[in-house]
Amino acid sequence: MAIESFDVAIIGGGPGGYVAAIRASQLGFKVACIEKRETLGGTCLNVGCIPSKALLESSELFLQASKHFENHGIIVSKPQIDVPAMIARKDKIVKGLGDGISSLFKKNKINRIAGLGKIIASNRIEVTDKTGSKSEIEAKFIIIATGSEPASLPCLPMDGEFVVSSAEALNFKSVPKDLVVVGA
């Protein structure tokens, strides 16, 4: 099987990676972007900045309706939180922005490769897809834009129920009675 060659290969499809891919393509380079997630946008779009801000906006509106509308002469009977609706709104925002990035990739003819990229030589990347199958590509230039992952504390490992990552916190089914945030 022949190894496909690119001018530029970017490992990571988050804000650094997808912007680099789009710009490189606009400058006339043949570009590949390797991303381990199903969707582009990285931590920021999928499980970080964007979804948390969407939920914060919903929470702020709830607070305004609960405590401050009366100051403006607006009477609202007791507001209630519908967590599934808030999560659905957050998911719709994330999907829309992710679809926008995918559209830009298509428009700019960027080869999107799903999998985990590993540099194995100065111009070669091994890609492992979600089934464990491996392939290789080569590129004159490689950009590493792998972003961030939540870190677990050795003394308090994440269990998905009582100790959760930011990704899991963005999908709570209800508002927790108590919550402690470690890190920022």
Residue ranges, per PLM feature:
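Beta1/beta-strand and adjacent pyrophosphate-binding region of the FAD-binding site
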Residues: A2-G14, K177-V182
